[in-house]
Amino acid sequence: MSGVEAEVIRTERLVLVPQRVEHAREMADVLSDPALHTFIGGAPATADELRSRYARMAAGPADPAESWCNWVIRLREGEENPGQGPLTGTVQATISPAVPGESGPGSWLVAEIAWVVGSAFQGRGIASEAARGLVGWLVRHPVRDIAAHVHPGHAASGAVARAAGLEPTDEWHDGEVRWVRRGAR
């Protein structure tokens, strides 16, 4: 395992909370709009399907060199109840060694990130703020290079990637453009 585990991340308006199986019911409602699947495919998951998915995620990857870090995005509701607002979406990072099989001094980690915000919460900068918070958290850990894959027709996700400090490359994967943030070497 890369040794990196999800921790609470706070931003100005959000709290990114490590995802738990118990979040599935509320997240099924948040992610229930079929329009969310326009670029990623599939259909909205039921609460039971999300519970199963979240349980698999919590179990971790088969590759012990990888870490799966998953968060739900919660709105902060005032200073008296920070972190008590509604869930609005998710962010995730798959973290692995930059060179497979290498760890220890001189090695570094890379991360593939993704995000989704429920339709009812879009257009408020939530995805951009969450992605910036995630990238900031990753670079405070030994993660040097960060990448995301964005459908070329999804301008909003491109804007989120750019806001998080990623830049588009000429690389494509499964019909999506690879965006990267390269750290210092």
Predicted feature residues:
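Short Gly/Pro-enriched loop/turn and capping motifs at secondary-structure junctions
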Residues: A120-Q122, G153-H154
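Conserved active-site tyrosine of GNAT-family acetyltransferases
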Residues: A161
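Conserved beta-strand-loop-alpha-helix junction that forms the acyl-donor binding cleft
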Residues: A148-G158
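Glycine-rich acyl-CoA binding loop
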Residues: G125-S128
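GNAT-family acyltransferases
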Residues: M1-A120, R132-W137, H141, D145, ...
